[in-house]
Amino acid sequence: MKCQLAQVTDAPEAIRTLKRFVADQALSERRNGREVTPTGKRVAIVGSGPAGLTAAYTLARQGHRSTVFEALPEPGGMMRTGIPAYRLPPEILAAEIEEIKRAGVEVKTAERIESLDRLLAEGYDAVFLALGAHRGVRMGIDGEDSPGVIDALSYLRRVNMGKCPTAGKYVAVIGVGNAAVDAARTALRLGAKEVTVVYRRTRAEMRANPEEVSEALSEGVKIVFLAAPSRIVTKDGRLAMECLRTMPGSRDAAPPKSIEGSEFTVEAETIIVAVGQEPEVPAGFPLSLTGRTIATAPDSMATSKAGVFAGADCVTGPSSVIEAIAAGRQAAIAIDRYLGGSGAIEERLAPPEEAMTPVKENYPSPTAIRNQIPLLPVAERLKGFPLVELPLSPETAVREANRCLRCDLPIVVEEANCRWCFVCQLVCSLRFEGAFDTSKAAIKLLPVVNAAGNRDVRISFDDKCDGCGLCVRYCPYGALTRGSSAGSNEH
């Protein structure tokens, strides 16, 4: 679900930025979790990305001995090798991993696992595969194996591991996902004079984070939309990409059609390919596959081999860090149950929030705009890899947090306060096809006759309601509020 603030203000809540603010405070306020009793069970986790580390930490908190195996010299997976330092400083990642180690997780680096049987023979009671999706997808065009052509993940990996490959003054990037944008911005920081990104669709269809795209453009990255490479050629030792203009079309439809006679050429010293990524499952893992990903049981994340589980990118294909963390937690639940536990992994380091009284007067104004997120000036960014997004001040963080509609709280219905003004239905109808048609609204007002024989109202919500709170915001009589109120109906 997307933040509902975007429905009624200029922008959604800056959730990611607020999470970072809280995390920055927490770095100096670490708390110990509950004491755990060892179960005597051992779990091997293959891959030290967000899914693997999350599963290992969570299983350790359940009392299982967790060991993480990482093929590279440093742990972190895609967080370490695929996300540039200007977005995720390696020292922050290292501090988080140290916290995981202190919870009892053992991390073995530079140790590639090629055989599942080896792990099971070593006495591990369960194995979790969190292999990620680190292999770039090929384009299938002539010349993509030419010297000077590299996939984005390999390029970012070399940079993040300290090898800093020189891309030259003129760089071309194919694709506009997050990896493509990261590679383009990284090339600028390594001295490229001109970086040109070629994408076969429009900006509205881009899969990359819109904020990252905007920052790339502000830094000087050029994006050529509605264009696709047809082949890569080398002439007189110079690399060039021959492209064709494409016709607009639906992102979910077949690849856009090329326009005859629209050829143009982009010359570059390095061409970075970022058209997709996929997992690489070792031959020594005799598992059932679905295409190029590992097949698992949806409810248990179990693979076709007993005792072996898999999750995140190697099962679903490329996803976000937060989705990988969620997969790691789900895997920990499944593995804990497999090992005889309850699967109850919830842990609170703070007391539960007390029941809240109805919220009405503190709702943000419909004109409340998003607070400006401080960014490092472009000239300073391009001198290296400093963090681009600067931390919020405590005052700004509080102002931004106060924009929240509190969608986590139920909508409290006080039918006795309803005056049949229909404002709730009118504003609700704006969210759906048929604006100002109250029959299209997700909130329903039903006339009834009460026990005293007087006309009354019953307020209900249909399945379209996603709790956006528009009705609460605009109800002038207090019939709809947020919070908990004894004796009232809640939705």
Spans of features found by a protein language model:
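Iron-sulfur cluster-binding cysteine motifs and their immediate structural context
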Residues: 1-20, 67, 74, 104-106, ...
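Glycine-rich dinucleotide-binding loop and its adjacent helix/turn
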Residues: 21-37, 95-110, 115, 136-190, ...
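Feature captures the FAD/FMN-dependent oxidoreductase FAD-binding
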Residues: 37-46, 94-141, 231-242, 270-272, ...
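N-terminal Rossmann-like FAD-binding beta1-loop-alpha1 element of flavoenzymes
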Residues: 42-67, 180-188
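Rossmann-like dinucleotide-binding cores of NAD(P)H-dependent redox enzymes
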Residues: 65-108, 184-231, 344-359
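FAD-site-proximal beta/loop scaffold in flavoenzymes
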Residues: 145-169, 251-318, 333, 357-360
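A conserved FAD-binding loop/helix module that cradles the flavin
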Residues: 183, 311-345
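Mid-to-C-terminal Rossmann-like scaffold of FAD/NAD(P)H-dependent oxidoreductases
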Residues: 214-218, 227-235, 247-250, 337-406, ...
